[in-house]
Amino acid sequence: MEKKIIFLCFFVSLLTLPEFISSQVLVEDDVPFPEKKFADRGECIRACAAKFTDGDLSKIKDVLPRYYKCVCWYYPTS
């Protein structure tokens, strides 16, 4: 019984490890978008990529259009 509990704890920690690691390198920042009140998702992705990742769209994880700005989650360039 004790080995099963230890194995279960190890298994759960193994499952949560990738989420913990990815949350450590993900950066949240915003970029002003004065052209529109609420930008399209594609416009936000392009604006975030241009400002934070030197135009690399693959490093943008998610964007959220807000009032005259875009909130970006991205992997920083090294």
Swiss-Prot record:
Site (Important for inhibition of KCNQ4): 69
Disulfide bridge positions per record: 44-70, 48-72
Tissue: Expressed by the venom gland.
Signal peptide boundaries: 1-23
Any one GO molecular function term: toxin activity
GO CC list: extracellular region
Region (Important for inhibition of KCNQ4): 34-37
Coiled coil location: none
Domain remark from Swiss-Prot or TrEMBL: Has the structural arrangement of an alpha-helix connected to a beta-sheet by disulfide bonds (CSalpha/beta). Since the toxin contains only 2 disulfide bonds, it is called 2ds-CSalpha/beta.
The family this protein is said to belong to: Belongs to the SLPTX(15) family.
The protein, known as: U-scoloptoxin(15)-Ssm2a
Source organism: Scolopendra mutilans (Chinese red-headed centipede)
